[in-house]
Each structure stands twice: as structure tokens, then as C-alpha cells.
């Protein structure tokens, strides 16, 4: 899925549904790509991309957003060795 990034009013609901509330402050809202909300982790600088409606997770690869599982998405954000 290819989408242009739009920056506007932050939507924190997808993130709040995906991670414990104490971890939400570790992320910055970066914008939206279609229905996918983009968050960047303040320390690892990695993205957590979450569909605003379905809560599904995506990674950006080769110019497209590709659906991945929740565990893979969270591991990619928090794994400092990647």
C-alpha cells in the first residue's frame, strides 16, 4: 500500500490501544499515510505504524506499507540491536 504522508492533528488512540499507557510518552506523532498513523520512538528512532480503524500494524519497506504482526512491530521498535 502506497500513501502520501499528511501531518495534522495528532491521533493518539491507535497508539494508546497498542502499548501500555506508560509507554505512550516515548513516542512522537509523525503524521498519517492514508489510514495508517505513524509514530516515532524517541530513543530508538524507529517507527510504529498503526491503522487507525483496524489497529493492524505496518512496516514501511521499498516504498510501501506492508502489514506485519503486533509482536514483530513492537520488537522492531524496541530492539536496540537492529
What are these regions (language model features)?
Residues 1-20, 60-82:
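Mixed-charge, Lys/Arg-enriched low-complexity segments
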Residues 17-71:
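Acidic, low-complexity, intrinsically disordered interaction modules
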Amino acid at each position: 500500500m502506497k500513501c502520501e504522508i499528511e501531518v495534522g492533528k495528532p491521533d493518539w488512540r491507535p497508539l494508546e490501544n497498542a502499548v501500555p499507557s506508560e509507554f505512550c510518552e516515548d513516542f512522537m506523532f509523525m503524521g498519517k499515510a492514508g489510514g495508517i498513523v505513524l509514530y516515532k520512538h524517541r530513543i530508538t528512532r524507529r517507527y510504529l505504524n498503526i491503522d487507525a480503524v483496524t489497529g493492524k500494524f505496518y512496516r514501511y519497506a521499498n516504498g510501501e506499507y506492508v502489514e506485519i504482526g503486533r509482536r514483530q512491530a513492537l520488537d522492531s521498535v524496541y530492539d536496540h540491536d537492529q
